[in-house]
Amino acid sequence: MKSMIVVACLALACGAHASGWAGPPANIALSQDGRNILDTPEVAQARAAHISALQQASKNNPNPNDDGSYDPRWDNEEYWQQAEGKWNGAPAPAWNAAPAPSWNGAHAAAPSWNAAPAHSWNAAGSAPAPVAETPEVAQARAAHLAALSAAKSAAPAQQQWNAPAHQDWNAPAHQDWNAPAHQDWNAPAHQSWNGAPSWQSGAPAHQPANIRLANDGSGILDTPEVAAARAAHLAAHAQAAHSAPAHAPQQHW
């Protein structure tokens, strides 16, 4: 039985003939590296026509995001009749239409506190802009500078605190502080530092002193009273030094 089945299979196999392409072999062209099969002239022509049609359609397409692929929603009629405007519907108002009235615009009933365009505090650059002075500050500054300038220009140079060297406070060694008794610091009233009438004496009270600054503004000049007292004091010292003996023995306290 088994042998008969085997014989029948062999007979069927021998009687069967191959089925498939019976035409001439296709003209297959390979790429230069032999890895890819090139398009036939018919396929290349069809591909070029397809690409040209896509390019032409993309030029006429108002929606650049549409790549031409099929969208199943297009089968629904409601998709084309929706309330919101579609690409083929009535044009909807643009989001950047006419600007709405601003709350601080010119047509407001009362002038807005910031209706005028405010300058940015750093509009000039990265650094903050300087703060402008108020009219009161500017006026006070101008008056102050004018007063300083007037005081400097009116101050005489010979009335400075630093007198010439020959009128120095430090007298030479032979004019020592410890002079003879008759040349003592406490000299007669007409040669004393306190000999000149004081402004606090019984004389009528003077007005407040007119304070004047030095040329560079760093010091206060002597008043006429102080300058006169200083000159009298220096003159008394010079007179005492001139009248003292050259080698008189010094008297110590």
Curated annotation (Swiss-Prot):
Sequence repeats lie at residues 97-100, 115-118, 154-157. It comes from the Eukaryota. Residues 54-74, 155-178, 187-206 are annotated as: Disordered. Residues 155-167 have a biased composition (Low complexity). GO terms for molecular function: structural constituent of cuticle. Keywords: Cuticle, Repeat, Signal. Coiled coil: none annotated. Residues 1-18 form the signal peptide. Residues 54-66, 189-201 have a biased composition (Polar residues). The tetrapeptide (A-A-P-[AV]) repeats found throughout the protein are also present in many proteins constituting the protective envelope of other species. Component of the cuticle of the pupae of silk moth. This is Pupal cuticle protein.
